[in-house]
Amino acid sequence: MSEKNIIIRLETKDDYRAVENLTRESFWNVYRPGCMEHYVLHCYRDDPAFVPELDFVMELDGELIGQVIYVRSEIDCDDGRKVPIMTFGPIGIAPAYKRQGYGKQLLDYSMEKAKEMGAGALAITGNIDFYGKSGFVPAKTKGVRYADDPEADYFLIRELTPGFLDGISGTYKDPEGYFVCEKNPEAFEQFEETFPKKEKLKLLGQLC
């Protein structure tokens, strides 16, 4: 995709380090002191659930300003079925370009590509004020419960195929790849040490 000075394209191996650094800058001290998202991204590239066809970067005038990855996931239905869907994230925008519409533009483009690949629905945890603008609704209104918090208003879902979730009642668990930092904290710390030092701060509004 190219619009004005913006290009959205697939990530290449040559982008890896720059994308990891962008992700680190985007999430640093946002949800917790420091961040983990850049390591999650780093590890997911070798995970079978990773969708390389939906691994996008965004450039503005040749400068890398955004990234998003997609991951295969599923709904565990109450009737025993497992319904394949997808999730995405991390999705990050460089701090200097946040709140200017680039994140939504990247998200909407990538969701259209996910739809073209046959994804029937996307499930995420996030802010309805942002994701609602791209068609997401609380998943519990569609019969899908978040395993960690069944009544969560922040667990969101969007049908990419109309009617895909009709008749479905079930539970969604975050894919295991999102827990690499907790499972191997030493490897995460070693990875973090390869980046420039940044101060970890405890700030109001963080989740942990």
Describe the role of every protein-language-model region:
Residues 7-19:
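A short beta-loop-alpha structural element at the N-terminal edge
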Residues 164-208:
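Acidic/histidine-enriched, glycine/proline-rich intrinsically disordered or flexible terminal extensions
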Residues 73-88, 98:
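A conserved beta-turn-beta hairpin within the catalytic core of GNAT-like acetyltransferases
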Residues 63, 81, 94-105, 117, ...:
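Conserved glycine-rich acetyl-CoA-binding loop
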Residues 116-119, 126-150:
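Conserved active-site alpha-helix within GNAT-family acetyltransferase domains
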Residues 20, 27-69, 74:
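Active-site rim helix/loop that mediates acceptor-substrate recognition in acyltransferases
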Residues 88, 93, 99-112, 124:
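Conserved acetyl-CoA-binding loop-helix of GNAT-fold acetyltransferases
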Residues 54, 58, 89-92, 119-125:
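Internal, conserved structured core segments that host functional sites
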